[in-house]
Each structure stands twice: as structure tokens, then as C-alpha cells.
């Protein structure tokens, strides 16, 4: 039914709903290094029981979680399904993009304060492949700098992230759309289609930087989540996260992905996507069947 991606077991002394949420001593000014405890879950849109792709891919979505001595880095990407009409597997582009980002981080070929640089270098490597890799993808990269306790993000398109503190959203990504249901995207097209296929530069990604605190919750996901679950539903699920151990985070990530997957196939549900469609003059109701990828992280004290 689902596949779970995990990374890291950190010493997490901040307990959700306790010190990290209410006590000023839990603020971002502590002297120790920070890290992320991350778990993930996802569904492919065309999921059938027992059929799962290997690796961190759910349908045309892809993701990665990587650790370096200077930072924890994670990302999600949503391959554009329209390429399938031209005989191209959309998951190849998104999957290769995320694997390249992961490798760059593990090799230390990045600057924590510049997540756009990770996207740019990865995209350039794809462009320089001897064997052409056609396709398009959105992308969202999140970097936690261990020593500065700052989160640096880059978001291109309609994947994105939320940062939750004290039960409220304190930071979130901005969705980037050219027009309805047409997000910003990185693309590689055949020569004859260059200038015709929609393609954005990594530099077009929305970039933010801000301090985080111990116990902050970071949810990074593709649009399959956000198109089917409004913030209030996500926050309701996050309230069930009572502590910051890995098993609890994994269970909550799974619960969020499962609920989004169920809502995606409810024809009577007025989903955020359906509401957005109505706002654009379309008579639409129901969830939006789509690939869903959820990475759920908690900021914790880091131990190597």
C-alpha cells in the first residue's frame, strides 16, 4: 500500500507540545548543532497492491534525504505526466534529478545557504548527459544548516513545504504557476521542441532563509498532498505527533499520506484543487488523483 523512506536517528530532547513549543529556552539560540529526524511515505497514482517501484519514487514523484557534516538536505520532485503521451517515462527525469541532488550533497558539492545552487548544478548535469534525458519536473529543496540553525529553501513549481511551530504554520513555500494547473518546471526537450516546451530556470525558484527551533515540524511534499489536504487537515494530523522519535514521525507521515490518498478518490469532496479550479471558472468537484510524496521532519539536537 505504501513505501516508507527513513533517515537518521538523532538525539531529540525537545518533546512536542512541551519544552520546544512553550519554553523560550527552546529557541533557535542554542549552542549545539541541529539536525533533522525525517520519515517519508508516498503513493503512486496508479498504485496497485503489491506493485511498488524500488527506491524513493512514488509514481512520477521522487525524493531524497541526505546528510552531510554541515547540513541535512532533503527534496521532492514531481515529474510532469504529460510526457507519457510522447513515449517518455516522466519518473526518469524527476528520479534522476533527485538522485543527482543527493549525490552532490553527499560529496559536499554544495553550500548550505544556496539550495538553488544544488538545483542548478543537478539540472546542468542532466543537460550534459551523453544520452538525452527528456522530461520535466517541479522541485523543492530544503537545507538545515547545522551550526547556524537556519533553514534554506528553494521551491520551483507547486511542490512545497510547511514549517509548523506550536500547532501553527509559521513558514510556507509560495506556489509558482504560469496559469491554472501549469506549474513552473525544469525541462529538457528534444531539439525540435526547444522553445515550445515550457521550461524555467532553476534561478526562477522561490528561495527563503529563516531560523528554526528545536521541535519545529517541517513537512515537504509534492502537490498530490497539497491539492487534496488543506492546511487545517494537515495540522490536525500533526497534532497526533506527541514526541520526536523516529517511529512516531514515521507513523504520522504514513497517516497524512494515506488520508490524502483516500481524499484524492472521493468524488464528493471539495478538495483544494477543486476549489482552485472553481476559482478559475471550471466546474470541478472531488479530489485530485495524483502521486503523493510526504517527507516529515523534526528539528532535533544533532549527534554524529
From Swiss-Prot:
<keyword id="KW-0464">Manganese</keyword>
<dbReference type="GO" id="GO:0010795">
    <property type="term" value="P:regulation of ubiquinone biosynthetic process"/>
</dbReference>
<keyword id="KW-0479">Metal-binding</keyword>
<dbReference type="GO" id="GO:0004722">
    <property type="term" value="F:protein serine/threonine phosphatase activity"/>
</dbReference>
<dbReference type="InterPro" id="IPR001932">
    <property type="entry name" value="PPM-type_phosphatase-like_dom"/>
</dbReference>
<comment type="subunit">
    <text>Interacts with FBXL4, BNIP3 and NIX; these interactions are important for ubiquitination and degradation of BNIP3 and NIX.</text>
</comment>
<dbReference type="Pfam" id="PF07228">
    <property type="entry name" value="SpoIIE"/>
</dbReference>
<dbReference type="GO" id="GO:0046872">
    <property type="term" value="F:metal ion binding"/>
</dbReference>
<keyword id="KW-0809">Transit peptide</keyword>
<feature type="domain" description="PPM-type phosphatase">
    <location>
        <begin position="69"/>
        <end position="299"/>
    </location>
</feature>
<dbReference type="GO" id="GO:0005741">
    <property type="term" value="C:mitochondrial outer membrane"/>
</dbReference>
<comment type="similarity">
    <text>Belongs to the PP2C family.</text>
</comment>
<keyword id="KW-0378">Hydrolase</keyword>
<keyword id="KW-0904">Protein phosphatase</keyword>
<dbReference type="GO" id="GO:0005739">
    <property type="term" value="C:mitochondrion"/>
</dbReference>
<dbReference type="InterPro" id="IPR036457">
    <property type="entry name" value="PPM-type-like_dom_sf"/>
</dbReference>
<keyword id="KW-0460">Magnesium</keyword>
<keyword id="KW-0496">Mitochondrion</keyword>
<feature type="binding site">
    <location>
        <position position="78"/>
    </location>
    <ligand>
        <name>Mn(2+) 2</name>
    </ligand>
</feature>
<dbReference type="GO" id="GO:1901525">
    <property type="term" value="P:negative regulation of mitophagy"/>
</dbReference>
<feature type="binding site">
    <location>
        <position position="223"/>
    </location>
    <ligand>
        <name>Mn(2+) 2</name>
    </ligand>
</feature>
<feature type="binding site">
    <location>
        <position position="78"/>
    </location>
    <ligand>
        <name>Mn(2+) 1</name>
    </ligand>
</feature>
<feature type="transit peptide" description="Mitochondrion">
    <location>
        <begin position="1"/>
        <end position="68"/>
    </location>
</feature>
<protein>
    <recommendedName>
        <fullName>Protein phosphatase PTC7 homolog</fullName>
        <ecNumber>3.1.3.16</ecNumber>
    </recommendedName>
</protein>
<dbReference type="GO" id="GO:1904775">
    <property type="term" value="P:positive regulation of ubiquinone biosynthetic process"/>
</dbReference>
<comment type="function">
    <text>Protein phosphatase that plays an essential role in mitochondrial metabolism and biogenesis. Positively regulates biosynthesis of the ubiquinone, coenzyme Q. Dephosphorylates the ubiquinone biosynthesis protein COQ7 which is likely to lead to its activation. Serves as a crucial sensor for mitophagy, though the underlying mechanism remains ambiguous. May dephosphorylate BNIP3 and NIX and thereby directly regulates mitophagy receptor function and stability.</text>
</comment>
<dbReference type="GO" id="GO:0005759">
    <property type="term" value="C:mitochondrial matrix"/>
</dbReference>
<dbReference type="GO" id="GO:0030674">
    <property type="term" value="F:protein-macromolecule adaptor activity"/>
</dbReference>
<dbReference type="InterPro" id="IPR039123">
    <property type="entry name" value="PPTC7"/>
</dbReference>
<feature type="binding site">
    <location>
        <position position="79"/>
    </location>
    <ligand>
        <name>Mn(2+) 1</name>
    </ligand>
</feature>
